[in-house]
Amino acid sequence: MIRIREAIIVEGRYDKNTLAQIVDAPILETSGFGIFHDRQRLALLRRLAETRGIIVLTDSDGAGFVIRNYLRGAIDPSQVKHAYIPDIAGKERRKRTASKEGKLGVEGMRPDVLLEALRRAGATIEGEETPAAGTRITKADLYAAGLTGGADSKAARQRLLAQLDLPEHLSTNALLEVLNALMTREEFQKLYI
């Protein structure tokens, strides 16, 4: 079991149960869209963000991104890290049919995939060194790499998302955030410019 400093925010109880088997960290549920109307739970998430930081780990479907974006606007962004699971087609064992978009959610991911998503997000893992921060990637770097502002930019971003095993719904700003968690500006320029 891996101990993580930050609290982890997931959508529901099955996500929480899956994660609790592999990490030792506070894990809280949003109760799906219930977080939109639960002021007390949101206040708790804000307090946790201030004291220990939080990691948002939602499904890679449209609903997961709605919840993630709500939290992004409701909690100080400097206290929040975002972990993204890859788009993997399938259905969870407990369900009769696949989800609306046909993708596995957090509860259906293998433990190694979840741990990798948390590491990519920059989780503070007890006993592991955190890499020193390098120069950050900017929107200008994305433009120079043809990932924004061009005729084929969307297709180029989709190829990059697939290459990095990231969800297809990732916005350009979220991609920038993930790239900064994965690599330095220098590493990005060597690979993509």
What are the roles of these predicted feature ranges?
Residues E6-A7, R13-N17, Q21-T51:
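Acidic, glycine-rich catalytic loops of TOPRIM or P-loop NTPase phosphate-binding modules used
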Residues V10-E11, T58:
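Short beta-strand scaffold positions
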Residues I22-V23, D76-S78:
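Short, structured coil segments at secondary-structure junctions
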Residues G34-H37, L57-I67:
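Acidic, metal-coordinating catalytic cores used for nucleic-acid/nucleotide bond scission
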Residues L44, G62-F65, N69-D76, D112, ...:
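Phosphate- and other anionic-substrate recognition elements at nucleic-acid/protein interfaces
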Residues P77-D87:
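Short, acidic/small-residue loops that bind anionic groups at enzyme active sites
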Residues I85-A132, R136-K139:
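Activity-critical C-terminal alpha-helical subdomain
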Residues E116-R119, A123-I193:
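C-terminal, charge/polar-rich interaction regions
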